[in-house]
Each structure stands twice: as C-alpha cells, then as structure tokens.
C-alpha cells in the first residue's frame, strides 16, 4: 500500500548571491517563478499527497494570492511562516505534520527540475529503511583545505557524493532528529545530517546533475537551457 506522503517545501531564501533584492524563489524561468516550477512538479506527481509550503512571514499573503491560487496548487495543505535559517523553517513545517503522514519529503523550493523517478527512489528507500536522500557522485577532485588556504588532504572521490533534495524520512525519525537538534542548539547543512546524529543510517539514491539548486545568475542560465531541452526547443 502506498504510504501517506507530505512534502515540506522551504522557500525562504534571499537574493543575496543573485546580487538582487528579489528573493531567488521568485526569479523567473521562462516567464514563471522558480518556486512555481517546483510546486507544479510536486502537484503533478501522484506520490505526493499534500504540500506544506514554508515562506517568510512577510510573503505569506503574497504567495497565497500570487502563487497558490493563480496556479491552482490544490495539494498545498498550508502556507507556513518560516524561521531565521532554513532549518528553522523546516522545523516550523514539521510542526504542521500530522500522525497520518507516514513519510515526510523535504525538497528545496528552488530545485525546479526534480523528476518523478528521483522522488520515487527516495520515497521507496525511506519507506524501506527510514531515511534516504538523493545525491550525485563527485566528478571533480575534492580537496580539504586549511584555513590558511593550503591543501590538507585530497579526499577519495569515489566515496564523495553531493547531497541534493528531495530527502525523505519516516515521520517519527525526522521529528526526533529535529527535536534533538533543538535541544543541542545544533544547525546542520541538510536534513539528513540531523538524522545522522541519531546514529540512524541514511540511504543514498541516485539524483541527477540537472536537479540543480538555483542560487546564482549562472544557475538561471542553466535552468533556461534545461527547460528548453525538456520542451524540445533545443
């Protein structure tokens, strides 16, 4: 039987690395905000039952009136006020997760090219083992560097994977991981790192090099190219 799946979508980023005052989730790709591209994909995937969208408190009315309603995003269960950091925003989203939700998927609002295949892999793995993420193997040589700018060690590239979202977890596991992080005042760089601190194994499934996170102007150029390819225009 298919598990009940809720997706938490944090979308509280700034436009700092875009050198813009406009938050990156509202930048346009082919005339439509990045966030809308992401949400429409999740809306269309049968694996996702409902969506909890987490945005800055000041954006809540704007998002409801300009994104949720116009694009008929009927899977959105609620628009939740975000926090100071991404982790705080996801924690606020988790407060709205209910007992019927078996699997919690966490996916960045600025990763608009997630595929149903990736999502299926992550959900299946999480349902089976409790925790899973999408990731891609490192293609470049990876160096660990001292604070003085000199190389400390060359890492074994065969063992290095670059984490992406979606990341999926049994509800109780991710709730416990976030509870522990709050108790310890710990901030990780992704959701899986909080689960790892509980000593729970996290399964890695193949992501995609096109499943990019939009953070820089160059990413927007790539995104336009990916979209044109999907639409058969190149």
From Swiss-Prot:
Pfam family, one: IspD
Gene3D superfamilies: Spore Coat Polysaccharide Biosynthesis Protein SpsA, Chain A
Catalytic reactions on record: 2-C-methyl-D-erythritol 4-phosphate + CTP + H(+) = 4-CDP-2-C-methyl-D-erythritol + diphosphate
Transmembrane segments: none
Domain of life: Bacteria
Site residues by UniProt (Transition state stabilizer): 17, 24
Keyword Transferase assigned: yes
Involved pathway(s): Isoprenoid biosynthesis; isopentenyl diphosphate biosynthesis via DXP pathway; isopentenyl diphosphate from 1-deoxy-D-xylulose 5-phosphate: step 2/6
Biological processes annotated in GO: isopentenyl diphosphate biosynthetic process, methylerythritol 4-phosphate pathway
Keyword Ligase: no
Keyword annotations from UniProtKB, A to Z: Isoprene biosynthesis, Nucleotidyltransferase, Transferase
UniProt EC number: 2.7.7.60
Disulphide bond pairs: none
GO molecular function list: 2-C-methyl-D-erythritol 4-phosphate cytidylyltransferase activity
Function: Catalyzes the formation of 4-diphosphocytidyl-2-C-methyl-D-erythritol from CTP and 2-C-methyl-D-erythritol 4-phosphate (MEP).
Protein family: Belongs to the IspD/TarI cytidylyltransferase family. IspD subfamily.
Record-linked HAMAP family: IspD (MF_00108)
Database matches in NCBIfam families: ispD
Name of protein: 2-C-methyl-D-erythritol 4-phosphate cytidylyltransferase
Species for this entry: Syntrophus aciditrophicus (strain SB)
Phylogenetic lineage: Bacteria, Pseudomonadati, Thermodesulfobacteriota, Syntrophia, Syntrophales
């Amino acid at each position: 039987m298919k598990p009940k799946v809720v997706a938490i979508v944090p979308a509280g980023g700034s436009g700092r690395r875009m050198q813009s005052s406009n938050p990156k989730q509202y930048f346009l790709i082919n005339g439509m905000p990045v966030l809308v591209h992401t949400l429409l994909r999740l809306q269309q995937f049968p694996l996702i039952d409902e969506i909890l969208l987490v945005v800055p408190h000041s954006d809540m009315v704007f998002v409801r009136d300009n994104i949720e309603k116009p694009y008929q995003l009927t899977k959105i269960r609620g628009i939740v006020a975000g926090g100071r950091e991404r982790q705080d925003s996801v924690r606020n989203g988790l407060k709205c997760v209910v007992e019927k939700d078996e699997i919690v998927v966490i996916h960045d609002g600025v990763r608009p090219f997630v595929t149903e295949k990736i999502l299926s892999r992550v959900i299946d793995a999480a349902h089976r083992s409790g925790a899973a993420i999408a990731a891609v193997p490192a293609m470049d040589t990876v160096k660990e560097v001292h604070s003085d700018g000199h190389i400390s060690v060359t890492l074994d590239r065969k063992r290095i994977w670059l984490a992406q979202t979606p990341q999926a977890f049994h509800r109780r596991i991710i709730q416990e991981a976030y509870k522990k992080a709050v108790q310890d005042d710990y901030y990780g760089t992704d959701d899986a790192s909080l689960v790892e601190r509980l000593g729970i194994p996290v399964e890695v499934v193949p992501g995609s090099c096109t499943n990019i996170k939009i953070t820089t102007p160059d990413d927007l150029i790539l995104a336009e190219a990916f979209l044109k390819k999907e639409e058969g225009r190149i």
